[in-house]
Swiss-Prot record:
Name of the protein in its database record: Sigma non-opioid intracellular receptor 1
Function per UniProt: May function in lipid transport from the endoplasmic reticulum and be involved in a wide array of cellular functions probably through regulation of the biogenesis of lipid microdomains at the plasma membrane. May regulate calcium efflux at the endoplasmic reticulum.
Ranges for region Important for ligand-binding: 96-103
Pfam families: ERG2_Sigma1R
Oligomer and partners: Homotrimer.
Notes on the domains: The C-terminal helices form a flat, hydrophobic surface that is probably tightly associated with the cytosolic surface of the endoplasmic reticulum membrane.
Family: Belongs to the ERG2 family.
Species classification: Eukaryota, Metazoa, Chordata, Craniata, Vertebrata
Topological category with respect to the lipid bilayer: Single-pass membrane protein
Start and end residues of each stretch annotated as C-terminal hydrophobic region: 174-221
Topology Lumenal: residue spans: 1-4
Amino acid sequence: MALWRGLRAVLAVAGLAVAVQLLRGWLGSKSYVFNREEIARLAKEHSGLDYEVAFSKIITELRKKHPGRILPDEDLQWVFVNAGGWMGSMCLLHASLTEYVLLFGTAVDTSGHSGRYWAEISDTILSGTFRQWKEGSTKSEIFYPGDTIVHEVGEATSVQWSAGTWMVEYGRGFIPSTLGFALADTIFSTQDFLTLFYTVKVYGKALLLETSTHLSELGFF
């Protein structure tokens, strides 16, 4: 019996290792809709403007360049995010299993843990300040409007945003792997299940839009 349990454990670990390698290969070889430089450049062009004006212009530009990829106005919603001890708000524009684009920020001073992801995440600041303290360092660095901060795969940092900080965020990697961190505080701390519902709903809508657009491009519709 003990031998059988041990064999099952070995097979499970081996299966997981194979799945991880296959996923890494897929992420490394697939084509993507967006890229970090494009999003950073677009956000930087509008940094320094009133952030609501900047948001509107950025959404318009993204819809022109990527038709069918950005959620329609009726599905755009600002949703609270509690994670790693900090509190912010996001407005999801695009999401798939491997990419997302969103607007993010906070109306109050807030700080906490960045999370550690199987995804690369970049933020370009439109207004306010972003202070980052990297793991293994004894000093923090502060970023200003127009700056882009890149959070590498597997990296962990301390983050701090001043009130009125707003930015454009792009993530690339295995996006479902980020949801545990993004939703843990909501489930186990704030127990704000309405926010949880909003988050899952908008991500689901984004996945449906991306699937529909992809199938349309392949000629299914």
